[in-house]
Amino acid sequence: MASTVGLAPGLSRKLKKVLDCRTDSPDLVASLNALSSFYDENSAHARRNLRSTIEKRALQINSEFLNAADSTQIALDRVEEEVNALADCCDKIAAALSSSAATTSDIISTTERLKQELEVTTQRQEIVNCFLRDYQLSNEEIKALREDELNENFFQALSHVQEIHSNCKLLLRTHHQRAGLELMDMMAVYQEGAYERLCRWVQAECRKLGDTDNPEVSELLRTAVRCLKERPVLFKYCAEEVGNLRHNALFRRFISALTRGGPGGMPRPIEVHAHDPLRYVGDMLGWLHQALASERELVHALFDIDSADHQSNAKNTSENIALKAGESDFTFVLDRIFEGVCRPFKVRVEQVLQSQPSLIISYKLTNTLEFYSYTISDLLGRDTALCNTIGMVKDAAQKTFFDILKTRGEKLLRYPPPVAVDLSPPPAVREGVSLTLEIIENYNSMMVSASGEKPAFDPVLSALLDPIIKMCEQAAEAHKSKKSGQLPRRSRTSSDSSQLTSVDALLSSSPSPPQNNETPSKIFLINCLCAIQQPLLRHDVASQYVTNIGLMIENHINLLVQNEVDTLLHKCGLSDKMQIFRSSTSELPLSERQDTSPAMLSECLKAFFGLVLGSEGSLPEFEQIQVPKLRSEACVRVAKTLAEAYEVIYQAVTDQQNGYPDPKSLARHPPDQIRTILGI
């Protein structure tokens, strides 16, 4: 029955709602906890009055809240009253401000207008101040330019004038050209007056520099000279003034050093040593070099070259050209300063050269003048009066040296010595070589400046030794002419001197060649050239000359060997036949020719073998050649040349085309055997 009867719809919904309600939700748990705080009896009456109980509880809570909010409400009411009062005050103030704004609007507009005018006036004032600074001189600057006393303020004012003058050029590019021209004219007047005054002051200061030997250049004077460089004409006047003053002062000091010496006589006068040319000239050059260093330092400090060089490193080409012009002025002043000492120096050096110094002294003087010529030109410049003077006296000393050599050489050539019996060099050769070695030592020890180099030594060697060699050649020629009428004799000693073999008879009957009388003269020349060459081998400076002498010796050795070989072949009767053996081109065999017939050739070869196989003295040994190496070399060359000549003859004899009947009996020694016999 219960399953068939359904529940009422409202109850069913409520029941479903209760069943669907989640008992673990936080709100439900909180509600139940709050209910348990005042619902403590679970009875039927209490459950029926649950709603009313809850509503009473809610009313109680609201009543408590209202009681608690009464004081707050009272405070809020008071605040509202005060806010209303404050709003009334603000309204009154706003009304007062509105009335004030209406009354002060004219004042505010006037103030704004005046403020804008003040800004414009301030800008104009700044522009005027900038214009006055860039285009006008202050009273203090004008006073500094016109005062008699020069100080740093003068140079600052002058620099400002130059700046204003440069700024005026900018005005000329605008529509203010008239103002620019007027300002430029005004600044030009100030500038020219200042430069003229500056020039007079610098000239006065420079006159003070000429009164002392070692003046000090103040920084103010350096600045003044640096400023004067902007006016080349005025600067040149001052530079000439400095040059003239120091010129006179240096001349007086040089004459005093020559004649009076230093203070109290120390150092002693330079002319005390006039008897010693080297020291005399060296002391004068040393004094000039020391004075040049001092004067150069003075002019260098005065013109402030280092500062100009430093400033030009970062500037354009035109300023570098200006720097070169400054260096030219620097050289001009130094040149002017030292012009005065040129003449007394030149006169004294010429007097030394006219006193006929010795050859060594004149050469040392030339080297000393050469060294100082380069040294002073490095400091002063090459195209200056002092350098030209030193160059002139150096040339004069060099001319004196070569004139002495020329006179000495002419004397040797005028009176050539006779040739000694042993063909040894004459004493003049040894003296000339000794003198040459001494001059070489002086050349090797001469001073050379950093920019200079040693002069060529070959002309000195030629002037020294060429006349000696020519003298030896003349002596040799005279010796040869003396013996030209005599026939040379050569003796040959055998074991039995009373008997002559057929070979000896042939040799003695053969006419001697005309070249034989040249042998002693050639040996004499070789000895002389070796006497010159040997001492020079240790010196590099004479290497080229030694090489040339070696070529001459080689040439004389060749001629000597050829003459001796021709003499030997002529004695054997082979001299005129060698050309036939070397260039036999005729169809007629050599055996059928009269001069190369077997009988004639047999006699000639017997004589040749007699020379080769004979006793000592048959072949020349050149005992009078004083250099063993050359003597041995000459003997070897003679032997080689004879062996080569015999080989030509042997090949012609053994050649079947020449038709010799018994070549082996005719030329019984092969060439190798002859070489062995000759020791080659």
Curated annotation (Swiss-Prot):
Name of the protein in question: Conserved oligomeric Golgi complex subunit 6
Originating gene: COG6
Function: Required for normal Golgi function.
Lineage per the UniProt record: Eukaryota, Viridiplantae, Streptophyta, Embryophyta, Tracheophyta
Native species: Arabidopsis thaliana
Record note on quaternary structure: Component of the conserved oligomeric Golgi complex which is composed of eight different subunits and is required for normal Golgi morphology and localization. Interacts with COG5, COG7 and COG8.
Record region (Disordered): 479-517
Alphabetical UniProt keywords: Golgi apparatus, Membrane, Protein transport, Transport
InterPro entries per UniProt: COG6, COG6_C, COG6_N
Main localization of the protein described in the UniProt heading: Golgi
UniProt similarity note: Belongs to the COG6 family.
Any single Gene Ontology cellular-component annotation: Golgi transport complex
Subcellular location: Golgi apparatus membrane
Pfam families hit by this protein: COG6_C, COG6_N
Superkingdom of this protein's organism: Eukaryota
Protein topology in the membrane: Peripheral membrane protein
Example of a GO biological process term: intra-Golgi vesicle-mediated transport
